[in-house]
């Protein structure tokens, strides 16, 4: 899954900063450069710059069904996790490698909930985040549907339990 693939990439990284963007081409890749520039100009306590569909300057075009699923998931995350973020799931993120190195050995999630686990564990280690606007243009059929949305909610529920116990 996504989480497994990103973790493998993180393990092989030797640069000062590391990032990823979803491969479905919905997000403009220029967002990576913007995130990197903002992260470079911030203090070391800022562990990552993450894309946010709900940022006031974001330009987001995608179907109502995806908006509904995204809204439900965001509300679920707000209730279950104590993260001061408006959007954890947009697939554009850049991090300081030193921040990733602190949490990488503890990451367990292999699916879509990986982003949330990563952000929670970074926050627990004292890192802050910058949310950045994104340009999102839904072009292709996604693998996300009602079934995967329900699976994501269930996985996220179990992640909340796991993080509370550990």
Question: Positions of the model-derived regions?
Answer:
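Acceptor/aglycone-binding surface of glycosyltransferases and processive sugar-polymer synthases
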Residues: 2-12, 17, 29-112, 138-147, ...
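Catalytic donor-sugar/metal-binding loop of nucleotide-sugar-dependent glycosyltransferases
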Residues: 84, 110, 119-135
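Acidic metal-phosphate-binding loop of nucleotide-sugar-dependent transferases
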Residues: 25-27
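DNA-recognition element of transcription regulators
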Residues: 116
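C-terminal catalytic/acceptor-binding lobe
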Residues: 126-166
């Amino acid at each position: 899954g996504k989480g497994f693939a990103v973790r493998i990439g993180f393990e092989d990284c030797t640069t000062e900063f590391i990032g990823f963007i979803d491969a479905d081409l919905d997000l403009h890749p220029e967002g990576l450069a913007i995130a990197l520039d903002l992260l470079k100009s911030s203090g070391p306590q800022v562990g990552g710059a993450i894309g946010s569909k709900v940022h006031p300057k974001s330009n987001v075009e995608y179907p109502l069904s995806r908006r509904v699923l995204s809204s439900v998931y965001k509300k679920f995350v707000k209730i279950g996790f104590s993260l001061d973020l408006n959007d954890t799931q947009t697939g554009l993120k850049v991090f300081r490698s030193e921040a990733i190195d602190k949490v990488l050995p503890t990451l367990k999630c292999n699916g879509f909930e990986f982003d949330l686990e990563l952000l929670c564990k970074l926050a627990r280690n004292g890192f802050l985040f910058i949310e950045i606007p994104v340009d999102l243009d839904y072009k292709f059929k996604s693998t996300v549907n009602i079934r995967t949305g329900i699976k994501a909610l269930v996985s996220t529920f179990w992640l909340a339990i796991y993080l509370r116990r550990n």
